[in-house]
Amino acid sequence: MQIRSFVYSLILCCISSTAIAQNSKFSGPYAQFGIGYQTASPSFSNTSLSAAGQSLTPTVSVSNASGFTGTVAAGYNFFSGTPLLLGLGIEYTPFPTSNATASASYSGSVGTYQNSASVHINNSLNIFIAPALALDQNKLLYGKVGYTGSSANGVNTDFYMGGTSLGFGYKQIISSGFYGFAEYNYVNYGSLNRSLSGNLKTPANVSVPATLNSTVTATTTNLLFGLGYQF
């Protein structure tokens, strides 16, 4: 009797889950926009200073950049016949991050050195897949895995940065296809080797050309709230 009850319960759960999937309002194409808060966090490693025929070790300090951000996105959620959906999407961030600043200094028997540079990331484009779970026909939990490419400006040049993006969020239908959402995203842009030219001042007060070399790693996080339309 207990086995029969268990089987009945399992069948009812399967039927209920299938009904949720079939009635989910989040299958098909969608478009959305979001606004929120973003933080860009650069870090530096393997930093060296070449000057006066020597390789010196400078001190590096970094300040993160935080501020307003906004995104627009579009995609398609594929119906799977279960409460699970799979989405494909593209997301564009037109707003640049604030400037993140790095300062390098050296003081020793060879002389003194001081230099700084600012970097900001802009025009980010993220292509992602989004596995999702329909809680009911109006509510959706989802994750995001993708690749983000961005242009960056700083350290006396423009350059490209790209890396893995991860995120998760929640959507809920408000009315007639319109929905609200909340979302958290993380991007790891990997590392790049960058150089910065400057001058080291010797104890005799003579300026000597110096080159700062470092491996730069950058990550960004953002928290978004927004509105969208499910077609």
Where are each of the predicted segments found?
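Cleavable N-terminal export/targeting peptides
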Residues: M1-F26
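Gram-negative outer-membrane beta-barrel domains
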Residues: I20-F231
